[in-house]
């Protein structure tokens, strides 16, 4: 998940996104995870990672589910998205190697806006 790892000298790992769609029958979804309500903290000056989330997309649109959804009926044509939390960063973001920040942007881990806000000593976020 882009921008989900906390900024730091050593950035936090990115969260993952999984989309679940029933194929030939309805089902019931239950979810559980940690750091869906509160962000994973950073250490020694590192920034927090992004919280995880559950979403449901159906005829009524897209809406966020509780952090531990229970007994959610999933009809055909409905999508459940699970985004796991990103990890918090370690150390001050200003200490991150500029080439590492550039690689993070090129690989799609961080958007230019995220880099501009969290790594202002680099100019890679201004492209």
Regions found by a protein language model. Name each.
Residues 94-127:
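Intrinsic disorder at enzyme termini
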Residues 68-70:
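A structural connector/turn signal
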Residues 56-65:
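Short, structured beta-strand/loop micro-motifs enriched in basic residues and often containing a Trp
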Residues 1-57:
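Long, charge-dense accessory insertions within large macromolecular proteins
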Residues 64-66, 87-96:
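Short, Lys/Arg- and Gly-enriched loop/turn segments at beta-strand edges
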């Amino acid at each position: 998940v882009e921008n989900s790892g906390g900024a730091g000298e050593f950035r936090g790992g990115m969260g993952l996104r999984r989309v679940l769609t029933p194929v030939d029958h309805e089902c019931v979804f239950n979810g559980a995870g940690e750091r869906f309500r509160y962000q994973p903290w950073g250490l020694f000056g590192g920034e927090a990672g992004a919280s995880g989330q559950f979403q449901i997309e159906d005829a009524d649109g897209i809406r966020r589910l509780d952090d531990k959804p229970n007994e959610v009926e999933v009809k055909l044509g409905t999508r459940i998205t699970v985004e796991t939390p990103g990890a918090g960063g370690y150390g001050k973001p200003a200490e991150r190697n500029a080439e590492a920040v550039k690689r993070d942007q090129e690989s799609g881990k961080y958007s230019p806006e995220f880099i501009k806000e969290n790594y202002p000593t680099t100019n890679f976020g201004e492209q």
